[in-house]
Amino acid sequence: MSRIDRLADQSADAGNRVYDWMNARFDLDSGRKFLGKAFPAEDSFLLGEVALFCFLLLVLTGMFLGMFFEPSTSDVKYEGSVAKFQGEEVPEAFASVLHITYDIPFGMFIRRMHHWAAHLFVASIGLHMLRVFFTGAYRNPREPNWVVGTALAGLSMGAAYTGYALPFDEFAATATGIGYNLATSIPLVGEVIGKAFFGGEFPSSATIPRLYFIHVLIIPIAIGVLLAIHMMILVRQKHTEAPRDDDVRGLTPKGGQPTDGAVTSDGGTESVVPKEDDSVVVGLPAFPNQTAVSAVVFFLTLATVAMLAGFLPVHNIAEYGPNNPAGTPELIMPDWFLMWVYGLLKLLPSWMSFTIPVVGIHISTEFVGGVLLPTLVFGIIAVWPFVDYHDKSVHFTANPLDRSWQTAVGVAAVQFIMIASIAGMNNLLGRALGVGTGVINPILTVALFVVPIGSGLLTYRILEDSTEQEHARQYTEQAEEADDD
């Protein structure tokens, strides 16, 4: 045996001893089993990975921005590159964002990446939840993961809101003031919430530090914990899978060498997996196949965010200028994912503001439209798996066309959010049509109820008729086959 061969054997023995030592303490064999876990080859399942990678990009770009951002409303003399503010006293938070944008190398690009990653994060979570809803992937035993996903959707919106409040320009300050008014409108505990989240009556010197703390620590930790819980539940329960058209044939028996055959959830392969058998998942092994797919998704997500950052500008704080308590921007609108809440605030009539007799608790339209109704919407979403409940565990996804009333409810809900979002842009709509908001708002109020109900009923009727026609066709075919026999 050559010296090189002896060294190779010694290295292998040393490696085995190290692995045995680590395995005895950390159970590495269970990790090796996970590497063979099956992931269905479904493109729509990758939306969850897009959300995960967007969160990673948000953390990385946020770390860069956090090194230069100053969470303070104290006035400082601006001495940066923007000529219009040269030598003026501006809030330190505003000055630091100008410094990041115009003076730090790649600062504008990183800020844009952070912005678009946030939008893509919210969008991918929303699309992921729509996919899960319409395919019934929330059913038993996956109700807990649906609740976790709902919480993630709410936290993603909260992270975005606290983020665009930080520059403390005129737009951000106005949006922050709206949030403060909504928080303090909550009966009994409003003032406490206002002090906890906004540092007291707005504007306050504690507002930006408080929101910054929530934005960079509280919400990211909560999102990270929920993502970890989401992934642990997913690994424990295994993926849902689309119904199979036929039995899936592998190339080796279960426990054999890895092949391109029917990979199952236990990390092995089976010679035949019956199409009705949902106890195993047929798909790609976590390593190396799914890992390679995930790597491609990551780089595509990174490329998409980078392309958006390179070509599309973001909120121009230099145009709005620093916070001016005596003024209000001509046009204030939230980001698209909060537009529906803004629309509800605009459509609610003033008579919905009232005081409850005897107890003297005041209920304002701000509370109803900006807090109560959005909370009700998220509450309904969270408990939906318990409304559409199944005693038996379901591991195959469903065809939305075969779920008449569930699909109808989903269509109606989407229409409700869309109409409410349009109401949030009633000023722009009025300008485009040449009419005032006094004309548009009553129409939108009626549409907010009529359109969702009408579209839901129409969807239900169409799907029911389609199902009846399919049953009639199958009955006719069976009758013809019986006659032939």
UniProtKB/Swiss-Prot annotation:
Transmembrane residue ranges: 45-65, 116-136, 146-166, 213-233, 292-312, 336-356, 367-387, 409-429, 433-453
Binding site for heme: 114, 128, 215, 230
Subcellular location: Cell membrane
Keywords annotated in UniProt: Cell membrane, Electron transport, Heme, Iron, Membrane, Metal-binding, Nitrate assimilation, Plasmid, Transmembrane, Transmembrane helix, Transport
Topology within the bilayer: Multi-pass membrane protein
Principal cellular location given in the protein's record: membrane
GO CC annotations, alphabetized: plasma membrane
Entry-linked InterPro entries: Cyt_b/b6_C, Cyt_b/b6_C_sf, Cyt_b/b6_N, Cytb/b6-like_sf, Di-haem_cyt_TM
Alphabetized GO MF terms: electron transfer activity; metal ion binding; oxidoreductase activity
Region of interest called Disordered, as start-end residue ranges on this chain: 244-273
Lineage top rank: taxon: Archaea
The keyword Metal-binding is annotated on this UniProt entry: yes
Record text on cofactor binding: Binds 2 heme groups per subunit.
Example of a GO biological process term: respiratory electron transport chain
Family designation: Belongs to the cytochrome b family.
Additional notes on this entry: Proposed to confer antimycin sensitivity to the respiratory nitrate reductase.
Quaternary organization: Probable multiprotein complex; a catalytic heterodimer of an alpha and beta chain is proposed to associate with additional subunits involved in membrane attachment and electron transfer.
Functional note: The respiratory membrane-bound nitrate reductase enzyme complex plays a role in generation of metabolic energy by using nitrate as a terminal electron acceptor during anaerobic conditions. Proposed membrane-embedded heme-iron subunit involved in a protonmotive Q-cycle mechanism-based electron transfer to the beta subunit.
Protein name in UniProt: Probable respiratory nitrate reductase subunit cytochrome b-561
Taxonomic path: Archaea, Methanobacteriati, Methanobacteriota, Stenosarchaea group, Halobacteria
